[in-house]
Amino acid sequence: MLCESEARSTLADPVPMAYLSVDAQGSSEVSLDDITINSSAGTVEVCSMKPADDPKTERSQMNKTGLASSSRPASNVWTTQQDGEVKLRMDEEGMGSEAPKTVHEVFQEAVSKYGDYYALASKKNGQWVKLTYKMYYDKCWKAAKSFLKLVLERFHGVCILGFNSPEWFIADIGAIFAGGLAVGIYTTNSPEACHYVAENCSANILVVENHTQACRKSLEIEHKLPHMKAIIQYGEELKEKRPNQYSWREFLDLGEDIPDSQLREIIESQKPNQCCTLIYTSGTTGQPKGVMLSHDNLTWTSIAAGRSLMLLEATEKQELVVSYLPLSHVAAQMIDIWLPVTFGGQVFFAQPDALKGTLVDTLREVRPTAFLGVPRVWEKIEEKMKSVGAKSSTLRRKVASWAKGVGLQTNLKWMNGHSEVPMNFRLARQLVYKKVRKAIGLDRCTKCFTGAAPISRETLEFFLSLNIPVFELYGMSESSGPHTVSIPQAFRLTSCGKEMAGCRTLIHKPDADGIGEICFAGRHIFMGYLNMEEKTKEAIDKDGWLHSGDLGKCDKDGFIYITGRIKELIITAGGENVPPVPIEDAVKEACPIISNAMLVGDKAKFLAMLLTLKCIINTESGEPGDDLTAEAIEYCQKLGSKATKVSEIISSKDKAVYAAIQAAVSEVNKRAVSNAQKIQKWVVLEKDFSVGGGELGPTMKLKRPVVAQKYKDLIDEFYADANTPTTTEERTSAVMWGGRKLPLVHSIVSLGSLQQIQRVLQK
């Protein structure tokens, strides 16, 4: 990684040649006029053009680089027009010099290499129904022809709303083949949010899973969408027939009279530097932004990520993955759709209630070789394992404790370059680790990943102690998914790894500790935000660097560490910048009964915290209940509390539990770098955060603006007293709220003074 001045000058310094190959069989070409190539440490921009009509003319237009001249070169590395073209960023050698390809070209290669291998597997009536890569491609081709029959216009959206399924994949890729834009919509979106996305991408077609979505969302907004032409329902048969509404079976038959040549002509006109997919951001602070991803964004990133992650091609050993994360998210699309197509992996679809409790059942049945879990998924597995462990015999618990100690120490040594395998580790592997992996379905999994949100060190160490290293990935929608990856050979706890081959990283305006904004460059950088020029200019600077909005640093070995979000930084009234995540994680680690923690105090005189307790989630609705988890109950019992419900703790102001929380907060405060970073007040909320409640996003990421608005009155009460606590006893007294009780919730900490807490802890 270069310093900022070197990095910027490198990107701005062109060199004269691109090393690219052109497929002689009529695939997309690359125009030299559309290329700006920089030195090997910098970037190159590339795009392709339509094949020439006359092969002789085509050859005459080639120069010594093997690139065709273009009459209409792309003029910039970004665009905001859905039919726009961009310069692709290529290197003169290495991973960044790979020839640009369209989605169709990559899929054709997959069929050629992996045609008879299984690609997709979904459960029908309790049995796995599988499609080979040839069958998968044929269905995408049929879907594309049916989209053309429905008069899908070039660069107009096909919105897909539903849980992961073969139909979701086929609709997505079929839309791209047909020249449209594949657009995922979160199933949790309101009709208003669905309308915004569909209108923003000029959607022609809406593909939904079931009758509920068709009626409550699509039909409610259909009349407001001038470009809408049809609604397709794939998860169940139509309950009532409406004009321009089709079942999945009817839809696939629609295009039978569309000649293959018509679709082939559209496919051959596609270029790697054109948009094919839109990923909509969550829009927690405004309307969602449509992240435009090109063919090259998807195809290049998938091969770069796969090689960096050491994925195996199916011809060597087929990778197996479980699809369950929302496909509207770029991480799920890259892991579930594009990486498998590129490397011939087999995708198994989990049940729709996977995140409500059935995921582990699917993992045990499939036994994947690679698995991506967002932090909340890993935390839930951790909680479940701890709950089961708590019910074991004393002997089993002692053996497990010993094995975890051995596992953590051995893996930490491996992480730092040691290679020996101690005898006690081998014994622990036979007695504990193998059984644990089998119990959660990860006994064949050599690649366990986490991403999309910060994960705590405690959770990483828990799995590491069981010989399950969880490797962090880091990126964003605007980088087509991953930018950095962790692998067994390059792994550090709390680091998100090293940049992928062909990618570059810049720490913008680093402070004395080397912490600054993380910026990206490479072929994975998005085209722009659809119809949002100013937002695009804010994201991509004049030198072509994508500003992530994340704060971080890079160590001497090239490992990148994320320290917080610029927008999430709490700036106190005294002007001190406070990253909330490390403080929140520290409180959760210090007090095992805490489920979620959110620090507040922006522009305020001191910090305060909202807390929730670990409770059992309703497997049907996904809503947090009142019953404490087994782990939480065990923790209460150790404290001397008989509580088994959240409401019992809150209504009685359970002294043992509240004192333990305060002790944890005090312990965290002792490690604070300044008084401004100490938690002065806290409150326990009556209900845990959830996707349904709006506090968590589809990937379980905390939506701070939503929480802040939802609990605005309560947060305001934190600061109702204008005086900032200054002494230890005054601070503690402030934490206890002086016995006041608010009407909004009944969980305000009100134990009284510091001495009162100490007496409880001493019992």
UniProtKB/Swiss-Prot annotation:
Residues 47-78 are annotated as: Disordered. GO terms for cellular component: endoplasmic reticulum; membrane. Pfam families: AMP-binding, AMP-binding_C_3. ATP binds at residues 281-289, 472-477, 550, 565, 678. SUPFAM superfamilies: Acetyl-CoA synthetase-like. GO terms for molecular function: arachidonate-CoA ligase activity; ATP binding; long-chain fatty acid-CoA ligase activity. Its EC number is 6.2.1.3, 6.2.1.15. The keyword Cytoplasm applies. Residues 62-78 have a biased composition (Polar residues). PROSITE patterns: AMP_BINDING. It is found in: Cytoplasm. Keywords: ATP-binding, Cytoplasm, Fatty acid metabolism, Ligase, Lipid metabolism, Nucleotide-binding. The keyword Lipoprotein does not apply. Residues 51-61 have a biased composition (Basic and acidic residues). It catalyses: a long-chain fatty acid + ATP + CoA = a long-chain fatty acyl-CoA + AMP + diphosphate; (5Z,8Z,11Z,14Z)-eicosatetraenoate + ATP + CoA = (5Z,8Z,11Z,14Z)-eicosatetraenoyl-CoA + AMP + diphosphate; hexadecanoate + ATP + CoA = hexadecanoyl-CoA + AMP + diphosphate; (9Z)-octadecenoate + ATP + CoA = (9Z)-octadecenoyl-CoA + AMP + diphosphate. Mediates activation of long-chain fatty acids for both synthesis of cellular lipids, and degradation via beta-oxidation. Catalyzes the conversion of fatty acids such as long chain and very long-chain fatty acids to their active form acyl-CoAs for both synthesis of cellular lipids, and degradation via beta-oxidation. Can activate diverse saturated, monosaturated and polyunsaturated fatty acids. PANTHER family: ACYL-COA SYNTHETASE BUBBLEGUM FAMILY MEMBER 2-RELATED, LONG-CHAIN-FATTY-ACID--COA LIGASE. Belongs to the ATP-dependent AMP-binding enzyme family. Bubblegum subfamily. This is Long-chain-fatty-acid--CoA ligase ACSBG2. It comes from Gallus gallus. The lineage of its organism: Eukaryota, Metazoa, Chordata, Craniata, Vertebrata.
